[in-house]
Amino acid sequence: HNNHPRAAGCFSRVLGTYVREKGVLTLNEALAKMTILPARLLESRSPAMARRGRLRAGAAADVTVFDPATISDRSTIEQTWLESVGVHHVLVGGQVVRSAGVTDRSVRPGVPILGGVA
């Protein structure tokens, strides 16, 4: 159990606060920093990362569908479990874990991604 709001609201906070409200990043810049850029950085240590952070045939199909106009984090230090708003669908490895704003907590399709050591 992580007792910090970043556990539940990190990306939603960036998209809602720093992209939409403050305009610090463009949507494309923020999405790249959350997806393709970390995946590319880790590929040399973990070849499985070459299938992450991308939308293309043969990729892992980790996808989040959200509304840029409403996405926002709600978690706090006191209530770290509060889910973000504006996240409609989530697929992990191509399997639906959130549909129409409802999370299916019985589904756990994630897999460990292992890499070599330096």
Indicate where each model-derived feature is located.
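Active-site microenvironment of metallo-dependent hydrolases
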Residues: 1-118
